[in-house]
């Protein structure tokens, strides 16, 4: 029997635009520290990670963001499976690609469309995907000692 190690780690965060050079942050295994002088983008990186994990748009408008139109986030499970999330900088749904794509995948590469909002009736959404990676898909939280059904766990929305 194969055991699954639940959990995931970030591998990279990248911004892409038609007339702009890629702006990418790469994450290593273990603890990553984002540091630097004031007004160098540290908080924006954290906000962008939140945005790519289902945070509501819009992503904060900063001058350095002008010209970029899409964001990629590379994820890896603790078992070594890799995925790339694609999202418009304006928000909306996600594209889920297998493997890590450090540049925007071409139209020939297959992907799964994921909704931005959680739904217990349809599991093709980002929240369900992330919860499944952590072995929490379909779980419900226990709010109190009431034996009646409880709300479904969701990562966002």
Can you annotate each of these PLM segments?
Residues 1-87, 93-99:
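Extreme N-terminal "head/tail" segments of very large remodeling/mechanoenzyme assemblies
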Residues 30, 156-157:
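A generic secondary-structure signal marking the coil-to-beta-strand transition
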Residues 91-156:
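Glycine-rich phosphate-binding loops of NTPases
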